[in-house]
Amino acid sequence: MTSTDIASDTELAAGGPVIAHLAPNIPRRFYRGGERIFAFRSAATPGDFDGRRPEDWLGSTARLFAEGGGGVTTLADGTELPDALAADPVGWLGAAHAARFGGDPNLLTKLLDSGERLPVHSHPSRDFAKAHLDCDHGKTEAWIVLAAEPGATVWVGFRDELGEDELAELVDAQDERLLEACNPISVSAGDAVLVPAGQPHAIGEGVLVLELQEPTDFSVMLEHERFGLELDHAFLGLDRPLALRSVDHGPLSAERIASLRTRWADVEGQGPALPDEGSEYFRAEVVRPVGAPVTVDAAYAVVVAVAGRGAIDSAQGSLAVAAGDVLLVPHAAGPLTVSGDVTLIRCMPPAP
C-alpha cells in the first residue's frame, strides 16, 4: 500500500462533490509503526509491509518534506485532492472559507501509530515559515489519543529554560539528555494534547493518535542521528543555527501543560475534542449520539469513526459508518444527522 492509494466510493455528483470514504494513504516513513492503523481501519496488512508505515494521511493536500514527497490524497476518479479543491472551493470548503482561504483547506489530518519512540523534534511557527520557508503555514498540531499501551508517555516542552548554547550542545551530543530535558506526560485513550508550534516534543512507543495539524511536513529534528536522518532533512534545508531559532527554549510550566490538555472521551452528544486555544489553527468535534440523533452544521471535514456503528444522513442520502471508517465530507453535503451507537470525531479547518 502506498501514498497513492485512492479514496474509495467517491464520485462527483452533478451538483458538486459528495461524501467520500477514504482508503488508507500510508507513505513510508523513517520510524517504525503502522500495525495499529491497519487494525483500527480493519484493513489487511499489505504483503510488502516493512514496519515503517506509521502514518495514514487523511484528506491530505500536503506532501512529505523528504522521503519521496508522497502523502497527497487521490480521489477515486484519479484527481489529487488539491486539484479538486481548487476546481470547486465553494462546494468543498464553503463560501466563507473559500472567500478567505481559496482552495486551501488549512488542515492536515493523520492517524499515527508509534511503533517506537519518535525523535525529539519541533515544528516552526507561521511567522518563521513565512520568513524562511516561503509558506503561510507553520505546524501547530494536536494529538487525540485513540489507544495507548499501559504507561504510555509523550513529551512536550523543555522543563527548564535552555540558552542558545545549551540547546546547541544537546543537539550536538545526540544523547539521552535531550529527551530528559523535556516534560514527560502520561497519556491514555481519551486524552487530547495541543502542541503549539515551536515546542519540542516526542510521542512514546505504543500510542495510536488522531492528529490535526497545519498542512505542512515541516519538522526540525533535534534528535536525528539514531534515526538515520540526513542533516538537510533534519533542519529543513536551513543552516542549523537558523533552524534552532524556531525552537521554543522553555520552560513549559505545569500550569501551561495543563491548559494544553483535555479529555475528549468525556464528551456526550456534541462538543469540542481539543482545548479552545487550538481553534485558531483547526477544530475537532466529538459527535456521540446519546439517546437521540445529533445534527451538525455543514462543514468541510475529515470524519473518523472511532467507536461503534451508526448512520450519517444528509441531503446526499444515508451512509452507514463503523469504527475505523474515515470520510471526507464536503461543505456541499449540508448538515449531517448522526444516529446510532457510534462515536465520530469531525476534524475541521479553523472557522473562516
What are these regions (language model features)?
Residues 182-194, 314-333:
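Short acidic-glycine-tyrosine-enriched beta hairpin
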Residues 142, 147-189, 194:
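Intrinsically disordered, low-complexity linker/loop segments enriched in Gly/Pro
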Residues 113-117, 148-151, 199-218, 318-322, ...:
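Ligand-binding loop in jelly-roll beta-barrel domains
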Residues 109, 118, 135, 141-144, ...:
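His/acidic/aromatic-lined binding-pocket segments of jelly-roll/cupin-type domains
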Residues 155-178, 210-250, 345-352:
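Double-stranded beta-helix
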Residues 292-293, 308-313, 326:
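Short beta-strand segments in beta-sandwich/barrel cores
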Residues 162-175, 297-307, 311:
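Short, basic/aromatic beta-hairpin or loop at an interaction surface
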Residues 1-162, 225-255, 260, 284:
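Transition-metal
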